[in-house]
Amino acid sequence: GNEFATIICSPNHLEELVLGFLASEGVISKIDELESIQIDDSKGGARVELTHQLGNFFDYSTKRMIASCCGKNREFYFQNDAVIAKTSMTHIELLQNQVLNMMTQLQGASNIFKQTGGLHNAAISDCNDFFEHRQDIGRHNALDKLYGYCIQTVSYTHLRAHETREDL
């Protein structure tokens, strides 16, 4: 197999991180596309076997693409991002107090942040309560862990994910 990525991360929920990362990169779109996944905590690595070939995926995943960004165009750094990105047509309205309340709840649940002074948190919420919460030293990792959790366990079309960065 080929090495796909090196990720510097917090050492928890690693299978979720791998699943979420592969999905966010467009390698998989559902858990059924995995033949197997093995996490080796002692070596800090993961081995994944897919049910399908990647074909020319690596040609697009590393090719830079810079769009003009005029009007509704969007800038993508890699060509593969343009292939997998989808525009959300969901209309969401949040009240200011909902956002502040969720942020306070999320910060209160972050024991590691309280101990270390810096960490990224992400949560799945219905705009009132949190259903699931992940932490990581990398903000994208925290989101990928939640994405992996969703792929493994829930139908998340009715849920919203959001992130807060906590600093001193």
Question: What is the predicted function of each stretch?
Answer:
Residues 115-118, 123-156:
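Glycine- and Gly-Pro-enriched alpha-helical subdomains that act as flexible
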Residues 157-166:
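Conserved small/polar residues in nucleotide/adenosyl-binding loops
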Residues 18, 46, 122, 142, ...:
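Small-side-chain structural scaffolding
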Residues 14, 139-140, 166:
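Alpha-helix N-cap/helix-start and coil->helix boundary motif
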Residues 2-125, 132-133:
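Intrinsically disordered, low-complexity regions enriched in acidic/Ser/Thr/Pro/Gln residues
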Residues 24, 166-167:
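General alpha-helical segment detector with a strong preference for membrane-spanning helices
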